[in-house]
């Protein structure tokens, strides 16, 4: 999952 509209970018970056 590189780009998930349901998951914020900062969440994906942090965890």
UniProtKB/Swiss-Prot annotation:
GO cellular component, one term: extracellular region
Compartment list: Secreted, Cell wall
Swiss-Prot/TrEMBL keywords: Cell wall, Secreted
Protein name as it appears in the record: 33 kDa cell wall protein
Species of the source: Phaseolus vulgaris (Kidney bean)
Record lineage: Eukaryota, Viridiplantae, Streptophyta, Embryophyta, Tracheophyta
């Amino acid at each position: 999952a590189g780009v998930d509209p349901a998951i914020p970018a900062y969440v994906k970056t942090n965890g």
